[in-house]
């Protein structure tokens, strides 16, 4: 699948398009009512400048549809949030929204039990995890002019200044590496995703903050090699990055060629210039106006509560939820129906996010939809937020070459210290654990996605990465691996 780049109109043109779409929708609703169809009941309200909430009742389902229309040219910013800012972590969408000062939010991507996102996830340029690198994702650029839908081009390298060693890092904050892989681990993984035992490892400590790479195509950060060893004991991260490969692996000699005290340049890219945040999902529903939603035998494709993100032509961003599993109130949508719903809203691009009992929309301090779990709002791995202004966590664009070797005084910065593992980490709550189990069994959420993958309904099994195949196998065996 090709990557889709959607360019957003700015200024008066975008505003005019936005108002025109709203006017046409009102006229269309009036025409249906006048003709006696009475299928749709539509209510609209202004949330904040550039953010509008539309509530739709479709009597044909019936279905209750909630749509946030976000026009970034009028101040709001689309942002992502990782639950509790750690891996794995579970948190309610409402909690993440309140912590980040959002005006509105929907739940984010699929999560494994415990809360690790199923997909490549990045926040403010910081790569959190790389699982499911063949999957699809949504990414806004920092200047709010482009939006990416499609397959991210994950790439991480470590280049030694003295030895000349160039290491390709295959996974990031996942499980143990395969024999032909080098894995990277940061303190974002806390105690649940740690460097492996029986590995050759190198610990890199930061000597600078992250900065844009050339043409803003990814990021770079100057590090220094603190230690290199092969051992049956796991290497501590100490606020830095640990690169590891099996002691018996094919890449062990290459990793051992790094020299203690050697400057190393870490570079990482999502394949989308200017993108700071990446939120994974599956599958894409619309591509450049083409409906690519499909039907399959898996329950994942059947009627479920749904959450998705789309782009309204070349104008506003759409965050959409559909309630489900409530006969007589809202039954939910199949993937094909969800794609058609985005078409009716005027979208040209759309991506399916975590659904089922995870489906949640939060606006101005309250959940405004009806989550399908008996306990109400589910704990989830991530959220897609609407901020009222600029994202305070985004890095300023820096010129390429600002991290030349030797320009830093070294040592650990305040940011690095903040990443240190807490000596008494917060344990998961009972509700959080139960939410993870519910997601694992939910046909509209993670369990349904992985069952569809394993059955070949979402992606041919031959194209699965080794890491994702392990995840699918673990779900089939009833094992929840960290």
Task: Briefly describe each language-model feature range.
Residues 26-479:
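Gly/Ser/Thr/Pro-rich low-complexity, intrinsically disordered segments
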Residues 482:
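Short carbohydrate-recognition loop motifs
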